[in-house]
Amino acid sequence: LGPMFVDLIAQRQELAAWVGYDDCEEFLWDWSYNREYFPEDLDGYLQEIQQELVPLFEAVQESGLYDQVYRRRYGEQQCLAYLSSGANAMGGGIQEAYEEMTGRALYDIAPSAQKYEGSFEIYLTSYDAPFVFLNPYEDISDFLSFAHEFGHFTNDYLTGGSYVTTDVAELMSQGMEYMSLCYATEPSAQVLDTARQLKMADSLGVYVGQAAYYSFERQAYQLTGDDLTVENLNAIYSQVAQDFGFDSVGWDEAGWTEITHFFTNPFYVISYVVSNDGAMQLYQMEQDEAGAGLELFLELLETEEDIPLLTLLESKELESPFERVSQVAETFREEFDLVTDGAGR
């Protein structure tokens, strides 16, 4: 896969030059995404994530939380029970979408060794309906993965096939993860508390991990000519692993080859970071006032136009992700009862 990615970068650089771009990242950004922020706007954001969130990420990795979370196995029926209880409690368009999905069997979450390794939601025009595909790990993470794809499903169902931007689409999916945790009642209170801990740890991991992937990606596309080699890509990833705390949990210098988006959707991964922040704001609203986050989320799920995320957040009186890193860090400190010094460590 390494040589394949080298070829892809070279071909994309050639295409960028052919249409008049000096910078391949700028070309891919302009042609693929409707964003109101640009690569140069993210320099300070990445630095803040490194300073404020990486130390917390390292502390959580060392806490043993994941060993506890993944110890127990869960099956398809428990996964359905989780989302069903949450959707019914949330009501409105969410409940309607869930009934459509299950009533017409517009999902596949059964385990199989022959299934594609991954999860996704897609709108099937021949069925005039969305469809959810999940290759489960048969652990508690499946609850959140199913909710994630169901967020996309609900947005597509309510709009008849949404045309929202990448960032906004991920707000729908990650928002559903958070809201499902607030309203699900199955399988049990203990399991739901474990799922909430996992989601918060996963959210911290999204900030740090996806920011790290973006940092790697933008450096990779700066390599040209004889410098564009697998060895140099491995070296960049090794440095990124140190910068973002991956070396605290073990890593492989060629681990970047496992990130599908690098091959299929260049510069997509930063969308996970900024949309996760918007989704977390919904969760915080819900925690502060029961029903407030859900009410706004139900409105957002009916978004269908190609509107940039920052404009959408502002229109709903939510904050810009780029102004919240310190606040987010404090939320995680409280969640995981972490004590750090003034530098975030």
Predicted regions and their residues:
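Contiguous, non-catalytic segments that form substrate-binding/exosite surfaces or channel walls
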Residues: 1-131, 315, 319
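N-terminal maturation segment of proteins
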Residues: 17, 213-221, 268
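Short, glycine/acidic-rich hinge or "gate" loops at secondary-structure transitions
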Residues: 18-27, 61-68, 97-102, 162-168, ...
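Post-HExxH zinc-binding segment in Zn-dependent metallohydrolases
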Residues: 46, 164-206, 275
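Conserved helix-loop functional segments at active or binding sites
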Residues: 89-93, 122, 152, 156-160, ...
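Short pre-active-site segment immediately N-terminal to the catalytic Zn-binding motif
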Residues: 125-146, 158-162
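Catalytic glutamate of the conserved HExxH
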Residues: 145-149, 153, 157, 171
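C-terminal, non-catalytic "cap/extension" segments appended to globular domains
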Residues: 146, 154, 180, 186, ...
